[in-house]
Curated annotation (Swiss-Prot):
Its main location: cytoplasm. Pfam families: MTPAP-like_central, PAP_assoc, TUTase, TUTF7_u4, zf-CCHC. Its EC number is 2.7.7.52. The modification Phosphothreonine is found at residues 57, 64. Uridylyltransferase that mediates the terminal uridylation of mRNAs with short (less than 25 nucleotides) poly(A) tails, hence facilitating global mRNA decay. Essential for both oocyte maturation and fertility. Through 3' terminal uridylation of mRNA, sculpts, with TUT7, the maternal transcriptome by eliminating transcripts during oocyte growth. Involved in microRNA (miRNA)-induced gene silencing through uridylation of deadenylated miRNA targets. Also functions as an integral regulator of microRNA biogenesiS using 3 different uridylation mechanisms. A zinc finger (CCHC-type) spans 963-980, 1345-1362, 1451-1468. Residues 1-30, 43-69, 89-140, 162-205, 734-757, 831-898, 1367-1424, 1466-1495 are annotated as: Disordered. It is found in: Cytoplasm. Residues 843-859, 868-880, 887-898 have a biased composition (Acidic residues). Residues 551-600, 1233-1286 form the PAP-associated domain. This is Terminal uridylyltransferase 7. Its cofactor is Mg(2+); Mn(2+). The gene is TUT7. It catalyses: RNA(n) + UTP = RNA(n)-3'-uridine ribonucleotide + diphosphate.
Length: 1495
């Protein structure tokens, strides 16, 4: 990159992290710089030109015969772990290699836990993540053009101040020393900025410049200002060489030369284009009364044709009456009510009929809807009856036979009925609302953005958006319902106020004094809160204060409001308050559109819009539609009489230019003929020549104050200028696609450029010197180029002020550096990106932002499908491509060499465009201002000839929204066709099992039990520990009783598994009235006195508060919980099941081994607990035919089931196992071997069991549906046998569910396909069957719910205590070192070392060479060298070690007692290398390793 990378600094604002040296050394050779977040430090690299960056998988997974050596997954999440321990069964070579690998990672010494082995590192892109030190979610991040990390940068008009202390992006060595410093907390940064201030002295010392140099500097800076580049007012202390800043791109620049290079970059051009597009639309004038009237006529037409009328409402009421009669017999106590558009009239004639059933409290919603489904199926009036019980609002769907209308029946949908009641009342009281909403909804329907199942918006939100607009107008038409007139009201307390109902045209609100004060808290969530205040407010404004505004004007204003004025990215659409509600107040992520339902304020009703391309498409449609309705569109008779005169607006020289090139001449002939086909919309005046008045754009703007007028869609604008010399050319630019415009002064042709799409128009005018100076042209030279109206790219008058001051003698060839820079500077005042139809597949600029606060879903990188036409001619009948990408139609190629010669002369080509755009500005302003003159000189035009229509082509420009799956968030398919739905995986049939293979399966299952089950001595030792602890605690807590539960007592425990202890106090049956948190803290204080315990850690924030500690003598980790009595009975139940049949234990141990090897058995990391898998085994054995075990909770001696309540739950089960054959008739009937049962279990959960429809419940034999439990939103549903409200699978994400099911499917194949002999690479059958590279395909379990620092669930990165402590230490040291600048270089290296400890993965192998593992083949070593730079890490200084040891107390080993690692990483925990069980205890997988890496 050379000097290209030097001129920039990156501003460090409150929303952006800092960077280190590697951030600048990596990435695309043609890209000057890149801003990424801190979490990616060390993950990138500098590459050779043309070398494609690829993901590399560090880690040695051993030899997998089925996939070849070093085979791992292609899953990007599989790169998390710094180490991977081999499966339990391995040969000596595996063990030796594993020892070598672990030697550098697990030293078990607190003094050197941060010392990494020097050697090459392989940078790995694990997943798209936010900055580890970035809390604000709207931080700007930029895209690596090779796909390293892509995020979307939102364009904001409010730019940061020039004085903001900033960070160098590249530049002098002094600055490079400081770039590696990680980002500090906002508070500390602000304090540091105050301490540092700015350097004294001017940014540029003008006193040493000569008069000529000073003049040149001033002229150059004037040109830079046009591109939003300004001189800094003061020199930042951190980056003293910075002289300029780009307000658009938020970077610091060292010199004018580097500023010109920045101006030419795609990033800057894109921001300029966005700014100009917005300013163009912003300057459009209000519509004239005639326009408003024409718009109103178009809206009335839509309402009459599609809106609901009285007869339609009567029809829907009749359907409700018919349905009431159908339900009368089986649901006598229920009543029906219409809601939705059938009641509010804010819909269409063919809208669904929404009916809600009100039912008594003794019935449940599932019971009601199941009866509804049954009744409708038996009715003759309704057909096509179906149910969607897995929707957020479960409904029964049917179709009324006579009318054919679709009916959706819900039960207890109270919030929707309240919202409907509100909308209905507003529609009756404010007559303009109904047509406005119907027009808005019809617009959304035409644009295909009202389909939530396809990633669009729910239709009713457009009514809320219209109401919100009417409330936010400068002269509001509707009132808000909460505000400062209410005593004690403030936005921060908005969560305490709720709308309750509508009564007699007033809104009833209620205030509850909630301590939370969170907007998301609703009345239902705080039932114990007592309303302390009620009030009411009118639904509409007083008639005296209500302005009279036509619907047409409201429509144009609404489009402008959402297209330009309202900040959709940061604010919430809430009709409750006048003040703007921020997303932070609602604690909603900053993603796309946020809309609050006034009666269901907790959830964002626009959350179905889950794709950035769809959001960009909606903005595109809003802006396009606003532009269409804001500009005048007329039908004139002259368009029919003199269509060919439109071609006469060409100067003599322009004709020469066209005639000079035969292609242009040919297309000009076509152009003349094409106007005939344009229809009545194409207009022209009678004049044959066109001369532009010699007005500068500034003068024009001052004279007329009107905006440029542009064409869109197929509508054609009729311009009536001041005199007959100025006419409009209405032509179809399809005929000009691909034209080459010849420039005589350079003797060159511009590259082929596809500029037009259907509906765009060409305007050619005489560009004479003295009227408008052509950019870069010489005297007496006029050129003609095409005008692109599609992208809203015309600059405003303000942007065009400097046009007449351009240097005419700039060197077009670029041979003079200074001249070229000046020319490029001038041109870039108007320059945009090359038009979207470039002949290259271009990576998108923007991609979806990551979000920590909600479940993070990976979205695929988007590209714009560009088309290449070799002839330069696009298909005239073809519309735009389907809208598939970032919304950037004018994307530049990422690499300079891809543009070829075109890039060299791009500015010359763009120049002509912008001059013509400037001329169009004048013409339009003249035409809009001087219509009366036009009427005198041209044929009279009746103002009633303004014409508008609702057309999909006009609103969308031929684009269509991207279909996005709501399940996987990927494009191109719907949820019902999602390939990630594991039920859609086609399973291959399994061959019959041979007796020999069955015998092997039996041996494998029994071996698992033998290797992992604890001995009698160990069980006795656990009991001894309990007794010892009990007696010790009783000294301070008299009457204390300790009881073992969990794996220690249920019969399914592993060797060295944790010791779970429940503490109760005699005389207290429950913890009611006991301060559990204080008791746990006191218990921890007492335990610290015990000499045999270490690392006592109270955890009071957990759902069940516990004390964790390490028992020195046994080496066990112990958890003591308080009054976890239900768990004691769960333990008894499992113990009873394990005693019924030995096969139960064998299968449960096999299942636990299987899940540990696949890393799917750790609930703290987002998967299922071993308890949940045990319940899955028991459920399978109960459902087997014949069953292996009974349902103990359904066996009892009397006629009625006994009831024994603990914590409100019946904990009865049949525990007399000796008497079981008497009460269970099928005892002993199942004689299958344990191997058959194990394979049967895998097949049961992959082939038979429907996870979507049924619940895994061991308390009943009959099937239990997820709808009955109302757990339809979960993926795997496992019911606790006693606590029936506890779903053990509630914490699973979709990714983890798919990962678990994939492991089961692969296990079915491995255990279900007989093999005659095991491959030689497998030393034992155990390693063959439990090879994680096969079972999980080499992938690691996803961690989308885990903290990215410590690896645990329950909090996100910004709340991680480990992160806070590290930041606090760094801030203290940074503040200290501010006074000692000579230590900055050393400190920055040490900072980077600490950061890499938590964010970077280390690969250490013998001979210091990285081992690379890829799914297909190993990458060559040279690629690794190219992708990664060796980082020789120095050991940190002693003072940091002591500080780290103090800060990282939460990460401590419960075996050796040392800090800095956890139990599973401790070498003392590994045991001997030859021990099978000890190998298993390492789990060999992600949980231990990822924690170290991410911590």
């Amino acid at each position: 990159m050379g000097d290209t990378a030097k001129p920039y600094f990156v501003k460090r604002t409150k929303d952006r992290g800092t960077m280190d040296d590697d951030d600048f050394r990596r990435g695309h050779p043609q890209q000057d710089y890149l801003i990424i977040d801190d979490h990616a430090k060390g993950h990138g690299s500098k590459m050779e030109k043309g070398l494609q960056k690829k993901k590399i998988t560090p880690g040695n997974y051993g030899n997998t015969p089925r996939k070849g050596p070093c085979a791992v997954s292609s899953n990007p999440y599989a790169f998390k772990n710094p180490i991977y321990s081999q499966p339990a069964w391995m040969n000596d070579s595996h063990k030796d290699q594993s020892k070598r690998w672990l030697s550098d990672e697990h030293t078990g010494n607190s003094d050197n836990w941060r010392e990494f082995k020097p050697g090459p590192r392989i940078p790995v892109i694990n997943r798209q993540r936010k900055d580890s030190f970035q809390e604000n979610e709207d931080g700007y991040r930029w895209q690596d053009t090779r796909g390293c990390r892509t995020v979307r940068r939102l364009f904001h008009k409010d730019l940061t101040s020039l004085e903001t202390t900033s960070e160098m992006e590249a530049g002098s060595p002094e600055n490079k020393k400081q770039r590696s410093r990680p980002r500090k907390p906002r508070k500390t940064r602000n304090e540091e900025n105050e301490q540092d201030g700015d350097l004294e002295g001017p940014v540029i010392d003008e006193s040493v410049l000569s008069t000529k140099e000073l003049l040149g500097l001033q002229q150059a800076e004037e040109r830079l200002k046009r591109d939003c580049i300004d001189r800094l007012k003061r020199r930042p202390r951190n980056y003293p060489t910075a002289k300029y800043t780009c307000r658009l791109c938020d970077v610091l620049i060292e010199s004018i030369a580097f500023a010109h290079k920045h101006i030419k970059e795609k990033r800057h051009k894109k921001n300029i284009k966005e700014k100009q597009e917005e300013e163009l639309l912003t300057t459009l004038p209000p519509p004239t009364p005639s326009q408003i009237n024409a718009v109103g006529i178009a809206i009335d037409k839509v309402v009459q044709e599609f809106g609901l009328h009285n007869e339609n409402l009567e029809q829907r009421l009749e359907i409700k009456r018919i349905m009431e009669n159908v339900f009368q017999h089986k649901l006598p106590d229920c009543s029906l009510r219409l809601y939705g558009s059938s009641c509010s009239r804010l819909g269409f004639k063919n809208s669904d009929v929404n009916i809600d059933i009100q039912f008594p409290a003794i019935m449940s919603q599932p019971d009601v809807l199941l009866l509804v489904q049954e009744c409708l199926k038996n009715s003759d009036s309704f057909i096509d009856v179906d149910a969607d019980f897995h929707a957020r609002v479960p409904v029964v769907v049917c179709r009324e036979k006579q009318s054919g209308l679709l009916c959706k029946v819900s039960a207890g949908n109270e919030n929707a009925c309240l919202t409907t009641k509100h909308l209905t009342a507003l529609g009756k009281l404010e007559p303009k609302l109904v047509p406005l909403v119907i027009a808005f909804r019809y617009w959304a329907k035409l644009c295909s953005i009202d389909r939530p199942e396809e990633g669009g918006l729910p239709p009713y939100v457009f009514a809320l958006m219209a109401i919100f607009f009417l409330q936010q107008r400068k002269e509001p038409l509707l009132p808000v319902y909460l505000g400062s007139w209410i005593e004690g009201f403030s936005l921060s307390k908005l969560g305490n106020f709720n709308l309750q109902d509508i009564e007699k045209d007033v809104v009833i609100w209620e205030h509850t004094d909630s301590a939370a004060g969170d907007t998301g808290i609703t009345k239902e969530e705080a039932p114990r809160e007592t309303p302390i205040k009620r009030g009411q407010v009118s639904l509409i404004l007083d008639v005296k204060h209500q302005p009279s505004v036509p619907v047409g004007q409201l429509w144009v204003e609404l489009l402008r409001f959402y297209a330009l004025e309202f900040n959709l990215a940061d604010l919430v659409i809430s009709i409750r308050v006048k003040e703007l509600v921020s997303r932070e107040l609602k604690d909603w992520p900053k993603k796309r559109i946020a809309i609050e339902d006034p009666y269901s304020v907790k959830r964002n009703v626009a959350r179905t819009l889950n794709s950035q391309p769809v959001f960009e498409y909606i903005l595109h449609c809003l802006r396009t539609t606003y532009k269409y309705f804001a500009l005048p569109h007329k039908i004139t008779k002259s368009s029919l009489l003199k269509p060919l005169n439109a071609i006469t607006c060409i100067s003599e020289h322009s004709k020469e230019v066209i005639n000079h090139h035969p292609d242009v001449q040919t297309k000009d002939d076509k152009l003349k003929n094409s106007v005939l086909a344009q229809g009545p919309g194409a207009t022209s005046s009678a004049a044959n020549t066109c001369k532009v008045q010699p007005l500068t754009l500034k003068e024009t703007a001052e004279s007329f104050g009107s905006p440029p007028k542009e064409e869109m869609g197929n509508e054609h604008i009729s311009v009536h200028p001041e005199n007959s010399d100025c006419i409009q050319a209405d032509v179809n630019s399809d005929d000009y696609k691909g034209d080459k415009v010849y420039h005589p002064e350079t003797g060159r042709k511009n590259e082929k450029e596809k500029v037009g799409r259907k509906g765009k128009h060409l305007l050619t005018v005489d560009q004479k010197r003295g009227e408008h100076v052509v950019c870069g042209s010489t005297r007496n030279n006029e050129s003609e180029s095409t005008l692109d109206l599609e992208g809203f790219q015309n600059p405003t008058a303000k942007e065009c002020e400097g046009l007449a001051t351009l240097d005419n003698k700039a060197d077009l060839d670029g041979e003079s550096t200074e001249g070229t820079e000046e020319l490029e500077d001038s041109l870039n005042h108007f320059t945009h990106s090359v038009q979207g139809q470039t002949s290259e597949m271009i990576p998108s600029d923007e991609e979806e932002e990551d979000d920590e606060e909600e479940e993070e879903e990976e979205e695929p990188r988007l590209t714009i499908n560009q088309r290449e036409d070799e002839d330069g001619m696009a298909n005239e009948d073809e519309l735009d491509n389907t809208y598939t990408g970032s919304g950037d139609e004018d994307a530049l190629s990422e690499e300079d060499d891809e543009l070829g010669e075109a890039a060299k002369y791009e500015d010359v080509k763009e120049c002509g465009k912008h001059v013509e755009r400037a001329l169009l500005v004048e013409l339009n302003k003249i035409s809009l201002k001087e219509e009366n003159v036009c009427e005198e000189k041209n044929s009279p035009v009746d103002q009633s000839d303004f014409f508008y229509e609702f057309s999909k082509l006009i609103f969308t420009k031929g684009k269509s929204p991207t279909v996005v799956c709501s399940l996987c968030k990927r494009e191109g398919h719907l949820k019902k066709d999602c390939p990630e739905d594991f039920k859609r995986i086609q399973l291959e049939p399994l061959p019959p099992l041979t007796p020999k293979f069955l015998n092997i399966l039996d041996q494998v299952c029994i071996q698992c039990y033998k290797d992992f089950s604890p001995t009698i001595i160990e069980d006795q030792a656990r009991e001894h520990i309990r007794q010892n602890l009990e007696s010790f605690i009783r000294q301070d807590f008299p009457g204390t009783k300790l009881s073992l539960f969990g794996s220690s007592k249920n019969g399914f425990g592993f060797k060295q598994s944790d010791l779970d202890v429940c503490m109760t106090i005699n005389g207290l049956e429950t913890a009611e009235g006991l301060d559990c948190v204080r008791t746990i803290e006191e218990l921890a204080r007492v335990l610290r006195k015990h000499s045999g315990l270490r690392n006592i850690l109270p955890i009071t924030t957990a759902k069940v508060p516990i004390v964790k500690f390490f028992h020195l003598r046994s080496g066990l980790e112990v958890d003591i919980s308080l009054y976890n009595t239900l768990a004691l009975h769960n333990t008894r139940l499992l113990s009873a099941y394990s005693a019924i049949d030995p096969r139960v234990k064998y299968l449960c141990y096999t299942m636990k081994v299987f899940t540990k090897m696949c890393d799917i058995g750790d609930a703290s990391r987002g998967s299922l607990s071993s308890y949940a898998y045990t319940l899955m085994v028991l459920y399978f054995l109960q459902q087997r035919n014949p069953p292996v075990i009974p349902v103990l909770q359904e066996i009892y001696k009397g006629e009625k089931k006994p009831e024994i309540f603990v914590d409100g739950w019946n904990i009865y089960f049949f525990d007399q196992i000796d008497e079981l054959p008497t009460y269970w008739s099928e005892c002993g009937k199942n004689t299958e071997s344990v191997g058959q049962l194990w394979l049967g279990l895998l097949r049961f959960y992959t082939e038979e069991f429907d996870f979507k429809e049924h619940v895994i419940s061991i308390r009943r034999k009959s099937l239990l549906t997820t709808f009955k439990k109302q757990w339809t939103s979960k993926y795997i549903v496992i019911e606790d046998p006693f606590d029936l409200n506890h779903n053990l699978g509630a914490g699973l994400s979709r990714k983890m569910t798919n990962f678990i099911m994939k492991a089961f499917i692969n296990g079915r194949r491995v255990f279900g396909i007989p093999v005659k002999g095991f491959p030689k690479d497998y030393p034992s059958k155990m390693e063959y069957f439990f090879d994680p590279d096969v079972l999980t395909e080499g992938e690691l379990a996803p961690n989308d719910r885990c903290c990215r620092i410590c690896g645990k669930i329950g909090h996100f990165m910004k709340d991680c205590p480990m992160r806070r402590k590290v930041r606090r230490r760094r801030d203290q040291e940074d503040a200290l070192n501010q006074r000692y600048p000579e230590n900055k270089e050393k400190r920055s290296k040490e900072d980077k070392e600490i950061h890499n400890k938590y964010t970077e993965r280390e690969v250490s192998t013998k001979e210091d060479k990285p081992i690379q593992c890829t799914p297909q083949k190993a990458k060559p070593m040279r690629a690794a060298a190219d992708l990664g730079r060796e980082k020789i890490l120095r050991p940190p200084v002693e003072k940091w070690k002591r500080q780290d040891d103090k800060d990282l107390r939460e990460k401590r080993c419960f075996i050796c007692g040392r800090e800095g690692h956890i139990k599973k990483e401790c070498p003392q925990f590994k045991g001997s290398s030859g021990s099978l069980s000890s190998k298993y205890m390492t789990q060999g997988k992600a949980s231990a390793k990822r924690t170290q890496q991410e911590s």
